[in-house]
From Swiss-Prot:
A Pfam family per the record: Sedlin_N
Cellular component GO terms held in the UniProt record: cytoplasm; nucleus; TRAPP complex
SUPFAM superfamilies the record matches: SNARE-like (SSF64356)
Protein name in the entry: Trafficking protein particle complex subunit 2-like protein
Lineage: Eukaryota, Amoebozoa, Evosea, Eumycetozoa, Dictyostelia
A GO biological-process term: endoplasmic reticulum to Golgi vesicle-mediated transport
Domain of life: Eukaryota
Membership in a protein family: Belongs to the TRAPP small subunits family. Sedlin subfamily.
Length: 140
């Protein structure tokens, strides 16, 4: 059973760059709920005291908030790109594993957006990126 239900990357203007659901039994209603959860987490990231720090060690924001079914975790880069993952509430995940996952996800994002054909601050539509993220999800 996969622990990660959704992975989202949001730009500095709070525009979605990448949102992907990873639950095989997700309905359209649940998909909409996940998008809503990701959107709500943006306010929490902005209000988080650590979100204004510039140190690389402070990029991991930890648990943003729990819902009935999910836990939402965040990661904020120094360029204000937000990485958000939604996991099942029943999942017991260590912070060290989450930090490693976010760093790997950020590396994939950097490699993809470093492409000269990528238009900055636009949706990531690369099939290769989607496949790499899909391969990364079971590692948590």
């Amino acid at each position: 059973m996969k622990k990660i239900v959704c992975v989202a990357i949001v730009g500095k203007g709070n525009n979605p760059l990448f949102i992907q659901d990873f639950s095989s039994s997700i309905t359209d209603e649940n998909k909409l709920k996940l998008h809503y959860i990701v959107h709500c987490s943006l306010d929490i990231i902005e209000d988080k005291p650590g979100s204004n720090k510039k140190l690389p060690s402070d990029m991991y924001l930890g648990l943003l908030y729990p819902t009935e079914d999910y836990k939402v975790y965040g990661y904020l880069t120094n360029t204000k790109i937000k990485f958000i993952i939604v996991v099942l509430d029943t999942s017991d995940i260590k912070d060290s594993d989450l930090k490693l996952f976010f760093k790997r996800l950020q590396t994939l994002f950097i490699n993809t957006t470093s492409n000269p054909f990528y238009k900055p601050n636009s949706k990531v539509e690369s099939k290769k990126f989607l496949q790499e993220v899909t391969n990364l999800v079971p590692s948590l």
